[in-house]
Amino acid sequence: MGKTKTRGRRHQDKQRKDEFEPSSNSAKEHIQQEESTYNDEAEIKETQPQMFFGVLDREELEYFKQAESTLQLDAFEAPEEKFQFVTSIIEEAKGKELKLVTSQITSKLMERVILECDETQLKDIFQSFNGVFFGLSCHKYASHVLETLFVRSAALVERELLTPSFDNNEKEGPYVTMENMFLFMLNELKPHLKTMMNHQYASHVLRLLILILSSKTLPNSTKANSTLRSKKSKIARKMIDIKDNDDFNKVYQTPESFKSELRDIITTLYKGFTNGAESRSDISQSTITKFREYSVDKVASPVIQLIIQVEGIFDRDRSFWRLVFNTADEKDPKEESFLEYLLSDPVGSHFLENVIGSARLKYVERLYRLYMKDRIVKLAKRDTTGTFVVRALLEHLKEKDVKQILDAVVPELSMLLNSNMDFGTAIINASNKQGGYLRDDVIAQLIQKYYPEKSDAKNILESCLLLSASTLGNTRDDWPTAEERRRSVFLEQLIDYDDKFLNITIDSMLALPEERLIQMCYHGVFSHVVEHVLQTTRVDIIKRKMLLNILSKESVNLACNVYGSHIMDKLWEFTAKLTLYKERIAKALVLETEKVKNSIYGRQVWKNWKLELYVRKMWDWKKLIKEQEFEIFPNSKPLQPKPEKHSRERNNSKEGSAFKKQKHYR
């Protein structure tokens, strides 16, 4: 007999008591007020960041605006000329640095100057912010300047570390290392760490500092998945055309003092959140609940994710993980409620997805076993929340658990793909990682979704790429959308996964009107799909000929196009063992020599097709073709003479007929 459902008012009261519900913004403000009741008014004023440092007068503003425009144009004849210009800006900016970095207009100039200045100038700018780093980190525009400054400073710390004899006579006065300047700045920020964690702008600065101190990659500030800036900031940075220099997207060596500072920062934050508790048993449930609220706060959550990622460098107990989650083998009602919130909230699911990737395996296995194992399909159906957690589990759990998830999810795959195409990629990767586990079932589900056998109008280009609703063929010069790019990448993954999808895609292309297929070749995204099917050894010769019949007609125009030229480069190999098609394309390009050579893309195609050799030494070009064919098809046999048996039979028949003739003449 199954378990009876518990009913009654007391049970409902207990459920409400255990339920996790984050505080509203007003409640958070109340919590912050409670935390500050022990400070007097003077101390409260000291903790408020100073963010106004005056404004530039009209003439100064006009000069710096013009300087910013000049740097953006970057029309200098020599690097020395550019450096002299940057030096003149720095001289003019002395004493006005704080006004410049807190202005929307001139903060962009300061970022450009920091990216272009030398080490001595960088240190001067760094020192000009002493005493106000906290205020600047909380400022909408100055915080971006600080991030650029800190990345360049990290690069300089490494250079000084690897070159102890770094020139210290560059300027008069005592020589100060970048390491010491950085440590001085960190001491200035330490009293404000908890405030920075939950601040709209300062939280990004804090995340960057943790990355630097832990020797993690300092990401590009304009990439979509960058941890350095917010989504709005990355878009704005692209629009104002500030390009990162070579110091970004790298890992830097750091001195031992940085590891000590990282430990000190994380320990300080932990004590701040636990009210200085000596052991875990001294931490109250209300304290744990408050910290869990921080974990699902859209500003503080990324910082906590990063702390959980790096705390293992020096803390074997993983204190922050244990502050968020329990470690006991039994279920906990409050933790269960918290997990349910994480699995159904966009911020919470992103938090759980990321910490799963950096936590100890035994901790992840515990969460999976207690709270997710029995409802994995239901979680996968939560396309904006739970599905991301399931993907993380597929990537990080042991083989046995991954196979259990695949057993549950694969039969539902065609339905799950309706709302989350990326989930298909996760399933394919997990199946491959487990030695092709359930591979045939995965393929069957994918075909059922994108190329159903019973459908008369089946076309994977339509079902997967949604061609009819896309920007293909638009005359308004619409940019390809992010959704089109995502779908194209997924189809390319399917093509690589199994030959069935390669052949299905080619069949779908051949089913299109020729004009439509040619349009795909000129599209910024869909051209990659056309390029991806041109795999010489995987496509049978009949389908190769059918594709070449269409593409060869457009060879000259394709060669002169930014996207089509890549397809033409692939056709050089795709025409192997199809000499007639190769010569037809080469002849068409040579007949339009002027047009091809006048195009930057056409010149590259001309070079890759070895057409200078074709024009000057045709036989050498044909010899090159034969060598290429042998490289691509090393096991293919050239035309062989008839076997000896047949030749003997032929000779015998000739001798027999001759004997008959002799007999006849007798």
UniProtKB/Swiss-Prot annotation:
GO terms under cellular component: 90S preribosome; nucleolus; preribosome, small subunit precursor
Tagged with keyword Membrane: no
UniProt GO MF annotations: RNA binding
Taxonomic superkingdom: Eukaryota
Segments of skewed composition (Basic residues): 1-14
PANTHER family the UniProt entry points to: NUCLEOLAR PROTEIN 9
Protein name listed in UniProt: Nucleolar protein 9
Gene source species: Saccharomyces cerevisiae (strain RM11-1a) (Baker's yeast)
